[in-house]
Amino acid sequence: MGFAEFAGNQRVVTALQGMLTADRVPHAMLFSGPRGVGKYTLAVMFAQAANCARRKDDFCGECEPCRRIGLLAEPAPLVEQGLAQRGESADAAMVERVPLILQTHPDVWSIVPDPMRLRNPVARPVLHMGQLRAVARAANFKPTARRRVFILDGAETMRWDLANIFLKILEEPPESATLILLAPNPYLLLSTIRSRCLQFYFAPLSTEQLEEILKRRTQFKPSERKLAAQLAEGSPGRAMHMDLEGAAQLRRDVLQVLERAVEGRSYAQLFDATAQLVKGQKESFENVLEVFYIVITDLLELAYGSTDRPLRDPALRQELGAVCKKIDLEWVAQAVDGLDELHGRLRRNINRQLGLDAVAISLARR
């Protein structure tokens, strides 16, 4: 056990170990990079190393602090447990009074966006005021072990008017506490928060690195490992947990929307395709948009790229080739701009169906 188990981004691991060895741990860090690249995993590992009873610059994984903190590595069951304890009928006031906090050790908290949707079924999970206030209070408590660590996953989801609560912690940092913010894009956070954090960017892994990880940690066949590595966009977490059959269906559904748009089908047929895509997928809407980017990248590569460069999804080469004959660079640019705008508006809890319909209409050939 230890940091040696972490795959990729060794420069970040080395920097964290150096901090622990020198006993110069910052009061706040910001981990940014693609979803599933290992930000949360390494944050939990750091919390283990900061409180390990046997080691100083690493963690053993066997002592009581390591084992208890390690339970945070799989947050989904803890989230379900927390929601069940709070009750399904919780109103907005209850959500603030009983904030969702994942805690398996007194000194380490994991704060994740609260999935309680209340009366809005399309609302994105966000960090709530109650969660931030709880962190502000607890950060000043003395640790029972060596260091208090607060992991804020999805830090970009906190409303900017609530960020001032968090900013006060950064302006008056406790001596024995470290806050680790996780966000896909650091610029989704206020500049005043970014400037007070030591920032680390987690780069996507290469396809070869992902295939090696999948070979060691999954039961995927060689062909499945290759496909998962190509579609994971450098994310080991996404590759290891990929439902290949579901991912294949999602890509077909996305391609169907683009096919109907470029073929000039009726708006009724186009909207049927977008409705099927939004309602029929178990994945997050953000992931659906990412698949749009992947398919469009393959279209661009097939139409204008090198012929010997592999597609991300070679199984759809024939269908992609048919679409390529009906598009140009202007269409590709318009598609990317529309997806970028839709992705940016997700923070405002817009209607996803209407947003995707608008993008599809803008791409329709008439």
Mark where each language-model region is.
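Charged, glycine-rich active-site and insertion segments that engage polyanionic ligands
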Residues: M1-A49, A53-D57, P65-R68, V98, ...
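Clamp-loader machinery-focused feature within the broader ASCE/P-loop NTPase space
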Residues: G2-D161
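Conserved catalytic/switch belt of AAA+ P-loop NTPases
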Residues: N140, N164-T178
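Structural recognition of the conserved hydrophobic beta-strand(s) that form the central parallel beta-sheet
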Residues: V149-D153, F166, A177-A183
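Residues immediately C-terminal
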Residues: T157-M158, E172, L188
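Conserved strand-to-helix beginnings and helix N-cap segments that scaffold or border functional pockets
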Residues: W160-N164, E286
